[in-house]
Amino acid sequence: ASMFKHDHYMDNGVRYPNGDGICKQLNETKCDAGFSYDRSICEGPRYWQTISKCFIACGIGQRQSPINIVSYDAKFRQRLPKLKFKPHMEKLKTEVTNHQNRAPEFEPEDGENLYVKLNNLVDGHYKFHNLHVHNGRTRRKGSEHSVNGRFTPMEAHLVFHHDEQTHFEPTRTKLGGAFPGHNDFVVVGVFLEVGDDGFGDEPDDEECKHILKGHHPDNNENGNGDNGNNGYNGDNGNNGDNGNNGYNGDNGNNGVNGNNGYNGDNGNNGDNGNNGENGNNGENGNNGENGHKHGCRVKKAKHLSRILECAYRNDKVREFKKVGEEEGLDVHLTPEMALPPLKYRHYYTYEGSLTTPPCTESVLWVVQKCHVQVSRRVLHALRKVEGYKDGTTLRKYGTRRPTQKNKVTVYKSFK
């Protein structure tokens, strides 16, 4: 996330490290200077601090992000709040554009109307700033954060910026007191997996027009509570937890995650799974960490998946555009589409930085423990977005910053 519309780094030429692997510090002071994810050049992640004096934190900061989260080292805090939004489930009209060699951002036209609710954790109100998704040079390693050294193909970031116009200041839960002052940003990180089943056929152009306007043929993904009829995604579906045919229902007779569910509350291996935390498929696998109370269930984010797929395929986003020449694509979405169901929003939290220059160290990270799945087509479409004048796509260098070696304290909302 960044507050700037950066230039393209190739506009000013490309520099290479000398024989000793050192890049000369430039006298530039611009905070919107261009940067790259190409690790072989001086504009790449290892040398971002040499591009501009505004980027100095990228090299000497003490709380740089992203990090590798070691789950058993994270400290449990009992009073950490649940992650909610105000107003709940509001659909926003956003605009997404080609961001050159960076992750395309979905920016709300009226973001001040949506706030993240983390009472007892943050001071003041934080309004929605953008949603974007990071990818890697390889299909398997695209998330910026990792947990116990494990990455996912993508990572979604929901960025919230402190609203100085409001004066609501709840009591703050102290996270160790290592860093003074308040944070300018709250960024919610969500690990995105990819799959093939349950996402339907590839939408055509006509269907994409309706999808991007917020019209979905299946409106049960975030339906009417735990006990409705035929909920698509358990908690938020119409038939949710006790649905007879709930897709992810905890006790759904025919649910994919029902009695013998992949990560269901009554999954075969629950609390004491044979393989503990790192079951057959890792923290969110068949033998998940805690089965019921603090376990995970991978949500199939069908609506988000189709929105992202259609947006990344659209010429306004896919084709390379210089700053000032980009065309915005209107997209209707709900930020909660990118999150696990409410009862599975267990998270890690720490005080870190933006993961793009200027690497500002004023971010409270809220990294979701439970993963969300989107169609494999989303990953393919994102990797085909053009980031360079010659048509080179985001597939070549990705849009992820390598994990940083800071010693920051990580807390968690679950045992």
Curated annotation (Swiss-Prot):
GO cellular component: cytoplasm; extracellular region
Reactions accelerated catalytically: hydrogencarbonate + H(+) = CO2 + H2O
One Gene Ontology molecular-function label: carbonate dehydratase activity
PROSITE patterns in the record: ALPHA_CA_2 (PS51144)
UniProt keyword list: Calcium, Disulfide bond, Extracellular matrix, Glycoprotein, Lyase, Metal-binding, Repeat, Secreted, Zinc
Domain Alpha-carbonic anhydrase, chain residue ranges per copy: 33-414
Chain residues that bind Zn(2+): H132, H134, H157
Region (Disordered): 201-297
Cited Pfam families: Carb_anhydrase (PF00194), Collagen (PF01391)
Biased composition (Low complexity): 220-289
Glycosylation (residues): N27
Expressing tissues: Expressed in the mantle.
Functional summary from the UniProt entry: Acts as a negative regulator for calcification in the shells of mollusks. May function both as a calcium concentrator and as a carbonic anhydrase required for production of carbonate ions, which are assembled to CaCO(3) at mineralization sites. Is important for shell formation in both the calcitic prismatic layer and the aragonitic nacreous layer. Shows inhibitory activity of crystal formation when present in free state but, when attached to the insoluble matrix, may regulate the form and size of aragonite crystal.
Protein name: Nacrein-like protein F
